[in-house]
Amino acid sequence: MAKYNEKELADTSKFLSFVLRHKPEAIGIVLDREGWADIDKLILCAQKAGKRLTRALLDTVVATSDKKRFSYSSDGRCIRAVQGHSTSQVAISFAEKTPPQFLYHGTASRFLDEIKKQGLIAGERHYVHLSADEATARKVGARHGSPVILTVKAQEMAKRGLPFWQAENGVWLTSTVAVEFLEW
């Protein structure tokens, strides 16, 4: 594997998140309903947009991503963001899964008043993202300011017929979490 510095890997990961989750049209690519993009087309369009992207750099980002944000298709010709989409081009069909008793959501303290009113909503994303452990939720919350960890009564939600899914990188997904299912 070629050597790249941390900044180059982080910048490339952010770029891939932007085009594979939110704005594929920004560089002129189209994602299929499951979020897949042709790798050759992605590289070509990224280069035309002034981004230094090669297959070797892509391979390194996919292989070293601590959160496993991206995956390759079984034939190695396509790539997608595992979850976190806001683009209407994508509607990944995750298999429904029974959650553990509790899941966790990391957020910043400045969002608490709104969450106490409306619960957790997906906002611009397709799903609310939840973590299986508090440590991961804390890291997520810290990205947005002083972190607060909310406990989600996931099994109670599931018993009431509210569905959960789990992305291939372990992130739990649900449509919304009402205030009654949150512990502060």
UniProtKB/Swiss-Prot annotation:
Coiled-coil regions listed in the entry: none
Pfam families reported for this sequence: PTS_2-RNA
Keywords: NAD, Transferase
InterPro entries reported in the protein's UniProt record: Ptrans_KptA/Tpt1 (IPR002745), RNA_2'-PTrans_C (IPR042081), RNA_2'-PTrans_KptA (IPR022928), RNA_2'-PTrans_N (IPR042080)
The keyword Ion transport is annotated on this UniProt entry: no
EC supergroup of this enzyme: transferase
Gene Ontology terms: biological process: tRNA processing; tRNA splicing, via endonucleolytic cleavage and ligation
GO MF, one example: transferase activity, transferring phosphorus-containing groups
Enzyme Commission number(s) of this protein: 2.7.1.-
Function summary: Removes the 2'-phosphate from RNA via an intermediate in which the phosphate is ADP-ribosylated by NAD followed by a presumed transesterification to release the RNA and generate ADP-ribose 1''-2''-cyclic phosphate (APPR>P). May function as an ADP-ribosylase.
Annotated family: Belongs to the KptA/TPT1 family.
Protein name, as recorded: RNA 2'-phosphotransferase
Organism: Escherichia coli (strain K12)
Gene designation: kptA
